[in-house]
């Protein structure tokens, strides 16, 4: 997706040839025009799927997922919580995930009230790197009996193992910008 790659090249900041900051348009401040283009692109790539729910993980995926949902007939968006409050109760699906950026393991949780075997889920997130968050979301969906129709990623770090993990599960993966690596603190796209 050229508009996304251009935005990454113009505004993204690479730190230590390993971390890409895009918080200025994707996961802190949101560029709504760009998110609408992302939503259209995911709709095009998953147009043959009968999606009735979008699943993501807090917090960076929520804004993206909400815009994407508008292109799938305003289906509900469910997000896995990293820090479930006492009002969530114990009737939850949960899975452990590791955050590459924060170097922390979380237990993510989704209430059993919001996903079940009737759901055809599209998982949406901002980044795919090690695949831990996606594995956790897929695990939660599978525990609920839902069908994971696909995974939509805005930016993928191809040089990490996330892609392989998802494809080995037989799930359609669509990434809008795929990064081969970093050189001299610049992004190298596939």
Curated annotation (Swiss-Prot):
Where in the cell is the protein located? Cytoplasm
Q: Record's InterPro entries?
A: PRibTrfase_dom, PRTase-like, Pur/Pyrimidine_PRTase, Xanthine_PRibTrfase
Major location category of this protein = cytoplasm
- In the record, what terms sit under GO molecular function? xanthine phosphoribosyltransferase activity
Q: Gene3D superfamilies, alphabetically? A: 3.40.50.2020
The entry's xanthine-binding residues are: 20, 27, 157
Question: What residues bind 5-phospho-alpha-D-ribose 1-diphosphate, as annotated?
Answer: 129-133
Could you say which EC number(s) this protein's record lists? Answer: 2.4.2.22
> Which CDD domains does the record cross-reference, listed alphabetically?
PRTases_typeI (cd06223)
Q: In which pathway does it act?
A: Purine metabolism; XMP biosynthesis via salvage pathway; XMP from xanthine: step 1/1
Keyword check for Cell membrane: no
Keywords for this protein: Cytoplasm, Glycosyltransferase, Purine salvage, Transferase
GO biological process per UniProt: purine ribonucleoside salvage; xanthine metabolic process; XMP salvage
> Organism's domain of life?
Bacteria
User: Where is it found, in Gene Ontology cellular component terms?
Assistant: cytoplasm
Keyword Cytoplasm on entry: yes
Q: Which reaction does it catalyse?
A: XMP + diphosphate = xanthine + 5-phospho-alpha-D-ribose 1-diphosphate
Q: What does this protein do?
A: Converts the preformed base xanthine, a product of nucleic acid breakdown, to xanthosine 5'-monophosphate (XMP), so it can be reused for RNA or DNA synthesis.
Binding partners and assembly: Homodimer.
* Protein family (similarity comment): Belongs to the purine/pyrimidine phosphoribosyltransferase family. Xpt subfamily.
| NCBIfam families tied to this protein | PRK09219.1 (NF006671), XPRTase (TIGR01744)
Cross-referenced PANTHER family: HYPOXANTHINE/GUANINE PHOSPHORIBOSYLTRANSFERASE (PTHR43864), XANTHINE PHOSPHORIBOSYLTRANSFERASE (PTHR43864:SF1)
Q: What name has this protein been given in UniProt?
A: Xanthine phosphoribosyltransferase
Native source organism of the sequence: Clostridium tetani (strain Massachusetts / E88)
